[in-house]
């Protein structure tokens, strides 16, 4: 059983299908009263449920992700990817599709987005990305994701077992051998998840408690951001407030302690800095001597020099190079950073995080621009040479417009004629077939590979793609079905497309586990089993 693609041996899998049968048979021979239990049925059920706990999943996927990180260090073409999934079914279908199209799941991950949990999974209803949703909904979704991925393993193996029984019944030894080899080389649908813990939902202890629950549910990688927990905003909205480094480092250590306590020693901590777009801090950092990390954080504060004579009642005053400085304080009691310091603060954040236990970085940017990211990563790598990023290929960016602007500006700078383009209107469909638009699309197509090579991006993710695909596909179906096309709007654009594209869900009873259940009934009741998959089951219409 290939539960260790790329040579990972942390999670022990059986040597062979026959070996698992032999182990079950040896056990059954010690239990003379277990009548009607067969070794092969036991072996099959064990193979269909190799990951028995979330910690099994976390340990296996952490080792997998560590191997991928090492591979990327040696070859930046080996970057990894994920799509954000807001339900276990979406994750399951993604991995089934990846296996169908590419034959393997290597370097394919899941991303769990706090934004989508807030918008789609909170009992309060749709919420903005401000950490107002129940924090227990995060580990609950992780558990759900892996429940569906494990069921994908069970379903695919069950189909192979049925084919094996058929080959034996027909006496087809060649086919039987092929199917047993397929079982022995089976690659699981279980892949790493990078899970969003926001800003920790409270203090360091609260972060630790939630991290434990997330790891126990199966998370091998926790992504934590340097915003103030109770002022948290989406990374692509205004009003972000960061915390001093000592506050953030305590939360990094809380995540690491949670991993180590639970025996997930390869666990990954992803530290996200929002400093590029955050102009405010809630606290002035504690500094013990000039040049320490607190002093460096405070050096970015927007201050004015004062004297004892013009100090006001209630002023907060800091000593900067022997001068009395008053940080600019807003009516909200927040302090303001100097404009134009975002990149410098990001670089300091990243270096400090990597020197204090972080494994991967996340720099939240306002646009998808390779050189902007690379410029910061170059500075970070002067201090930490193997620094690497997870990067948010965010739907909050207008990708079409951003890349058309980039091409337009490059053409203009190179002295090329741009007179037929209106930069302010480049989103218009009339530009779609122009050389500028085609060049922009090519840059979008190669963005991930190019930035993996140039900007140190190990993992490319889209945070909320399946939020948008759900809306788009539903809009298309509603337009056709409730319009003149009626039932043809569903049949032509959904069911017929599923059949022609080989989408497994066209047999929705099978996908939901009906065949697995039927086979279990046969294991338990033998010939007396009342099964759903008989001649009158309408799923037979789909072959």
Describe the role of every protein-language-model region:
Residues 7, 11-455, 461, 525-543:
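Alpha/beta enzyme core
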Residues 371, 471-472:
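Extracytoplasmic/secreted cell-surface and envelope-processing proteins
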Residues 462-467:
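Short acidic/histidine-rich active-site segments
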Residues 473-493:
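Long, continuous compositionally biased terminal/linker segments
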Residues 492-543:
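C-terminal functional modules
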């Amino acid at each position: 059983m290939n539960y260790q693609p790329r040579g990972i041996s942390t999670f022990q899998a059986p040597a062979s299908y026959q070996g698992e049968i032999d182990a079950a048979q040896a056990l059954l021979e010690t239990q003379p009263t277990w009548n009607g239990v067969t070794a092969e049925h036991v072996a099959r059920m064990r193979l269909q449920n190799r990951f028995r706990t979330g910690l099994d999943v976390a340990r296996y996927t952490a080792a997998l992700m560590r191997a991928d990180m090492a591979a990327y260090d040696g070859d930046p073409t080996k970057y990894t990817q994920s799509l954000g999934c807001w339900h276990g079914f979406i994750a399951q279908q993604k991995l089934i599709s990846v296996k169908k199209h590419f034959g393997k799941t290597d370097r394919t991950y899941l991303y769990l987005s706090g934004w989508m949990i807030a918008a789609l999974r909170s009992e309060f209803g749709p919420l903005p990305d401000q950490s107002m949703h129940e924090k227990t909904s995060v580990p609950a979704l992780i558990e759900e994701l892996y429940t569906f991925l494990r069921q994908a393993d069970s379903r695919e193996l069950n189909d192979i077992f049925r084919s094996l029984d058929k080959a034996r019944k027909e006496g087809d030894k060649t086919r039987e051998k092929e199917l047993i080899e397929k079982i022995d080389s089976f690659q699981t649908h279980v892949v790493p998840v990078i899970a969003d813990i926001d800003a920790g939902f409270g203090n360091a202890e609260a972060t630790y408690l939630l991290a434990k629950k997330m790891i126990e549910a199966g998370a091998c990688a926790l992504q934590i951001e340097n915003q103030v927990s109770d002022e948290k905003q989406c990374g692509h909205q205004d009003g972000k407030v960061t915390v001093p480094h000592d506050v953030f480092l305590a939360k990094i250590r809380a995540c690491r302690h949670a991993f180590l306590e639970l025996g997930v020693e390869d666990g990954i901590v992803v530290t996200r800095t929002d400093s590029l777009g955050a102009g405010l801090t809630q606290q002035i950092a504690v500094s013990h001597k000039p040049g320490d990390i607190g002093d460096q954080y405070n050096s970015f504060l927007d201050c004015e020099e004062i004297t004892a004579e013009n100090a006001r009642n209630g002023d907060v005053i800091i000593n900067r190079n022997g001068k009395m400085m008053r940080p600019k304080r807003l009516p909200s009691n927040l302090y303001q950073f100097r404009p134009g310091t975002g990149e410098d603060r990001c670089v300091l954040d990243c270096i400090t995080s990597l020197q204090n236990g972080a494994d991967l970085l996340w720099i939240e940017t306002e646009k998808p621009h390779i050189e902007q990211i690379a410029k910061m990563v170059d500075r970070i790598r002067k201090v930490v040479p193997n620094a690497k990023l997870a990067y948010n290929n965010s739907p909050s960016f207008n990708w079409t417009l951003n890349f058309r602007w980039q091409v337009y500006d490059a053409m203009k700078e190179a002295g090329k004629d741009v007179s037929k383009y209106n930069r302010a209107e480049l989103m218009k469909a009339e530009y779609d077939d122009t050389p500028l638009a085609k060049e922009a699309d090519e840059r979008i197509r190669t963005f991930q590979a190019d930035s993996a090579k140039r900007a140190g991006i190990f993992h490319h993710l889209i945070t909320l793609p399946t939020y948008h695909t759900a809306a788009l596909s539903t809009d298309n179906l509603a337009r056709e079905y409730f319009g003149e096309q009626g039932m043809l709007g569903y049949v032509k654009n959904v069911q017929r497309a599923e059949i022609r594209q080989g989408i497994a869900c066209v047999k929705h009873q099978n996908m939901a586990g009906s065949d697995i259940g039927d086979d279990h009934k046969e294991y338990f009741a033998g010939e007396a089993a009342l099964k759903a998959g008989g001649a009158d089951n309408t799923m037979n219409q789909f072959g």
